[in-house]
Regions:
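A short, charged/proline- and glycine-enriched loop
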Residues: 14-16, 292-295
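Active-site loops and adjacent core secondary-structure elements that bind or stabilize anionic groups
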Residues: 232
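Residues at the C-termini of beta-strands that transition into short coil/loop
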Residues: 212, 253-256, 301, 320
Length: 324
């Protein structure tokens, strides 16, 4: 099944779906290997992995380059956290074209102004685009996509900027009417009060996605009862990776040794495995000339060895079934 079709199925199936954050090829592959059915390509996590702020400091082309590695490394759908679409409707059209070329299944666009500010940063200006302008972005995205299953998700930031339920519902309804395949209702409260109120009042057939980063203590069963479509675990891969790296770095710095830490970290062999080293070894056997040719003789000479198995002493190499 196409990745776009997989994502659309996740959004519209009656069971609660989950998307897990990833920010590069390695984390995306780990997400799939763990068993998740879809990936959230987080703007915060990608920015953090590049060492920049989540304020559109990473260009959209840099994000797309990372997405290409993520897509190549996985077979499950990726939903991009596309911020505001990186500009106006025309930037959105260009973005959709490039995402489809890289087999990205969908994009989530928020109704704030470019350049955006992360929704959880306190004290910074959080300005919303007009509903009409944002509806134009949604229509432009839907008109641009070639694959009918490519998903455009409209992220509603009304609660984030301090507006009430009526404003959130009005915006979400307008975005659904403009053609959004789903709406994402966002909240920075520590409880799910706003989300519960929204879901109880939502009467559209368009599925609703949530991001419980702040109201993480809410039991998942509550989301099922509310008929939420999809839950996004939005930044927990990058945050756990940061904690693990900081712990390892601190230990090595303090002890000036890797003896204590080595048993606690992933072995190099596991790194090779997730990179697909075994597949490359098999491919070398199929495609490299002379890979499986038996050695019939050895000429000892000065200079670098041309023998592939360089780690084996020449006296131990098999010639005609016997070592020298």
């Amino acid at each position: 099944m196409k990745k776009t079709s997989q994502l659309k199925q996740l959004l519209y199936q009656p069971e609660l779906s989950f998307l897990m954050e990833a920010h590069n090829g390695l984390s995306a592959r780990l997400v799939e290997q763990t068993g998740f059915s879809g990936i959230w390509a987080s703007g915060l996590a990608i920015s953090a992995s590049l060492g920049v702020r989540d304020n559109n400091e990473a260009s959209w082309t840099q994000v797309v380059d990372i997405l290409e590695f993520m897509s190549d490394a996985t077979s499950i759908p990726i939903l991009l956290d596309g911020d505001t679409g990186y500009g106006n409707f025309n930037n959105v059209r260009r973005l959709i074209k490039k995402l489809e070329q890289r087999d990205i299944a969908g994009v989530c666009i928020e109704d704030k102004l470019f350049p955006k500010t992360n929704s959880f940063i306190q004290g910074e200006q959080q300005d919303l685009a007009s509903s009409d302008e944002f509806c134009g972005k949604i229509k432009a995205a839907k008109d641009t996509q070639v694959d009918p299953d490519f998903c455009v998700v409209a992220r509603v930031e009304a609660f984030i900027v301090g507006l009430g339920l009526d404003a959130a519902l009005a915006r979400a309804s307008a975005y659904a009417d403009a053609g959004a395949d789903a709406v994402l209702i966002h909240s920075k409260q520590s409880t799910a009060t706003q989300i519960i109120a929204f879901m109880q009042a939502w009467d559209k057939a368009v599925p609703v996605i949530i991001v419980p980063t702040k109201y993480y203590a809410t039991p998942t069963e509550v989301f099922r009862q509310l008929r939420v479509s999809t839950v996004i675990w939005a930044n927990h891969t990058i945050r756990s990776a940061m904690q693990a790296m900081q712990s390892t770095l601190t230990t090595i710095y303090k002890t000036q040794s890797i003896k204590e830490i080595d048993p606690q970290i992933t072995p190099v062999s596991a790194v090779f495995k997730i990179q697909g080293a075994d597949e490359l070894a098999d491919a070398e056997k199929r495609y490299l000339p002379g890979y499986n040719t038996a050695i019939s003789g050895i000429i000892l000479a000065a200079g670098a060895s041309r023998i592939r198995d360089i780690d084996t002493p020449k006296c131990m190499l098999s010639v005609g079934g016997k070592s020298l």
